[in-house]
């Protein structure tokens, strides 16, 4: 018989988890103003809030940390990292930063001016925040297929070429660059096809524009190209990554995802003028150019992590666990953004809690119910995260309202996936008893989901 799939690693160190009572969780979430970001980690049993910086490093990464060069200038660890990034992406100019949003801050400080228009595919929260905080506008050009969570198409993260062309045809002079998020987190961790990257490149060239990849999960995107797109089944993940980046002019990276580290990020580009411009903001915001807010040991671990994760065995293990959880939800009839993405399950809260109006934030309500049910912490990717329109100050209800359940890399077993699925089933089975949601009692102007205060209705 054919041998079943198994993880590409064995476990060397473990961390205990603490269970809690329903009564404790009801009190804790109330004290947190019904914002799961405000919970303490020891109040959480299985943490699916994010996959950013929450993964486990390998023994080789830990070994590399012992060799980290902590020199302020000219760190050997930086040059090791730079060599690895250039080998994978083809980008010669590299600036390290302490995380992905810092990379955006440094690069966008150089490129984004008031009144600018930045088209792309579902800009994530920090990306949109850095654009809108500069009095510029993020224009979503994602394909319409992404709006139908039950539609099975392989690349729902794609940029719609017609939408992109329309923006450029009408307002090209206001566009500093095009941004493509791989994978498309806000749309459900959905991948972008290689063909679509070529199309975006061709449109950019037509109008003389450059392309940036928001690359936090670029390896997951490469895996889906390997698995779903014709002509790539015989390619290595590194070969697919190299072709992907050949269609970009630069990238921002949160290394806390596909870099397999707990902290770090970087900017990389093929253009010296972008590098020279970003340098001016790296030094005052992040630090000197050969550390940029990162320790030498963290740069050393990141270099190893990037190399490890761009091997098929590593990334396949990661994706298969997310697919395992998706199969359990299929068994229970729970709707999520299909097909399942690379780093998380995105439960369609509008379908689960269809009796709760959008003004009462169904996805946040579902996240609260799941936490109370089993101590599983998820994250709303929906109407609260969307923030208010920067001009009208009205809530933006036009997109999807999803409960994201991120799976940390190399951390949980499939038994934990079974717990998550069973807890969701319990909530799903009593969904008709959940008739009211939450209201906002305090919020910030940008990226409100991190600190918003809510009340149950």
Predicted segments, located by residue:
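Conserved glycine-rich beta-strand-loop-beta hairpin in the small C-terminal domain of fold type I
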Residues: 322-323, 337-349
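Conserved PLP-enzyme active-site core in the AAT-like
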Residues: 2-34, 38-55, 61, 70-94, ...
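Phosphate/diphosphate-binding loops
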Residues: 256-258, 362-369, 373-374
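Short glycine/threonine-rich loop-to-helix capping motif typified by GTGT followed
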Residues: 192, 346-361, 390-396, 449-455
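Flexible glycine/proline-rich, aromatic-decorated loop/lid segments
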Residues: 137-140, 269, 274-277, 297, ...
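Short, conserved charged micro-motifs
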Residues: 276, 354-362, 410-419
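Flexible, glycine/charged-enriched surface loops at secondary-structure junctions
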Residues: 289-296, 316-318, 333-340, 381, ...
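PLP-dependent enzyme catalytic core of the Aspartate aminotransferase-like
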Residues: 309, 373, 385-457
């Amino acid at each position: 018989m054919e041998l079943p799939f198994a993880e590409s690693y064995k476990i060397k160190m473990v961390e205990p988890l603490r269970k809690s009572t329903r009564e404790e969780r009801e009190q804790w979430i109330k004290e947190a103003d019904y914002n799961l970001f405000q919970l303490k980690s020891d109040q959480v049993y299985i943490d699916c809030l994010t996959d950013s910086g929450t993964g486990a490093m390998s023994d080789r990464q830990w070994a590399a940390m012992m060799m980290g060069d902590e020199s302020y200038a000219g760190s050997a660890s930086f040059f090791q990292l730079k060599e690895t990034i250039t080998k994978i992406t083809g980008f010669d100019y590299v600036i390290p930063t302490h995380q992905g949003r810092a990379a955006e801050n440094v690069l966008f400080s150089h490129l984004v001016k008031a009144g600018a228009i930045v088209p792309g595919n579902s800009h994530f929260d920090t990306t949109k925040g850095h654009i809108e905080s500069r009095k510029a506008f993020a224009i979503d050009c994602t394909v319409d297929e992404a709006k139908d969570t039950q539609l099975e198409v392989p690349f729902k993260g794609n940029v719609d070429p017609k939408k992109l062309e329309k923006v450029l045809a009408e307002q090209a002079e206001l566009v500093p660059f095009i941004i493509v998020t791989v994978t498309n987190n806000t749309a459900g961790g959905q991948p972008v096809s290689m063909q679509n990257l070529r199309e975006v490149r061709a449109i950019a060239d037509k109008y003389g524009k450059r392309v940036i990849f928001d690359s936090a999960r670029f390896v997951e995107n490469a895996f889906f190209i390997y698995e779903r797109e014709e002509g790539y089944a015989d390619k290595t993940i590194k070969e697919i990554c190299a072709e992907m980046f050949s269609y970009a002019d630069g990238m921002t990276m949160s290394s806390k995802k596909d870099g397999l580290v707990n902290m770090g990020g970087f900017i990389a580009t093929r253009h010296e003028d972008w590098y020279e411009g970003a340098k001016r903001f790296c030094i005052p915001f992040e630090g000197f150019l050969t550390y940029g807010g990162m320790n030498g040991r963290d740069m050393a671990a990141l270099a190893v992590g990037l190399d490890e994760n761009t091997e098929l065995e590593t990334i396949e293990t990661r994706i298969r666990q997310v697919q395992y959880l998706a199969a359990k939800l299929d068994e229970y009839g729970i709707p999520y953004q299909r097909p399942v993405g690379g780093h998380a399950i995105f439960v369609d809260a509008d379908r689960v809690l269809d009796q709760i109006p959008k003004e009462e934030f169904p996805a946040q309500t579902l996240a609260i119910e799941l936490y109370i049910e089993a101590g599983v912490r998820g994250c709303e990717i929906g109407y609260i995260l969307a923030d208010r329109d920067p001009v009208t100050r009205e809530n933006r209800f036009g997109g999807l309202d999803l409960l994201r359940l991120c799976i940390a890399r190399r951390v949980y077993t499939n038994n934990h996936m079974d717990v998550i699925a069973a807890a969701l089933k319990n909530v799903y089975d009593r969904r008709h008893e959940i008739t009211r949601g939450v209201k906002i009692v305090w919020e910030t102007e940008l990226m409100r989901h991190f600190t918003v205060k809510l009340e149950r209705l």
